[in-house]
A protein has these predicted regions:
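Metal-coordinating catalytic core of metallo-dependent amide/deamination hydrolases
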Residues: 5-133
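Active-site-adjacent C-terminal substructures of enzyme catalytic domains
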Residues: 122-177
Length: 177
């Protein structure tokens, strides 16, 4: 499973004991002009990767994370992308989860969330994008071109009444789901 949240420390012992395969990350949100290396999520993910990355015969992987476009800024997105390139880390993000998120990103940046993440280098590293409910045609091409893996979250999407991912089109496009 993949998880990005705030309290991974309590999860690690259970993950190790169960032997389950897991990509784990401390969620990153920022609403100001903070430097990436000053954020608690940066420190937590560096610690996670330093202490646990590759544990259980490689079954526990420490990823980097950007919660989403609307909970970050270009400076942070680019810093996470650079950190991933420098360390070989994978990245987890939420992408086009709701119509509001998707349309507001287009209003702010003139780009869909997928195009925005591509522009800022996130997809230069192996990436798992959660949700992907409101993708546009160009977004399928972006995800395929960069080998992005989509993690569908139907229970979450139903809870938010945000719709459901077009998995058949993803598969037809050659996207790993």
């Amino acid at each position: 499973f993949s998880d990005m949240y705030f309290f991974f420390g309590g999860m690690v012992p259970a993950i190790l004991e169960s032997g389950i395969k897991c990509n784990l990350s401390r969620g990153l949100t920022v609403f100001d002009d903070s430097d990436y290396t000053d954020l608690p999520a940066y420190r937590d993910n560096v610690r996670l990767r330093g202490e646990w990355n590759g544990a259980n015969n490689g079954r526990l992987i420490g990823d980097l994370c950007i919660h989403g476009e609307y909970t970050s800024n270009p400076k942070i997105v680019e810093a996470v992308a650079q950190h991933a390139r420098e360390t070989g880390a994978r990245i987890q993000i939420h992408l086009s989860e709701t119509q509001t998120e998707h349309e507001e990103c287009k209003g702010r940046h003139g780009l869909t969330p997928a195009a925005y993440m591509e522009k800022h280098g996130i997809f230069d590293s192996p990436t798992t994008a959660a949700h992907c409910v409101w993708l546009e045609d160009e977004d399928f091409d972006i995800l395929k071109r960069h080998g992005v893996t989509v993690a569908c979250c139907p229970a979450s999407n139903l809870k938010l009444a945000s719709g459901y991912a077009n998995v058949p089109k993803m598969l037809e496009s050659g996207i790993n789901v």
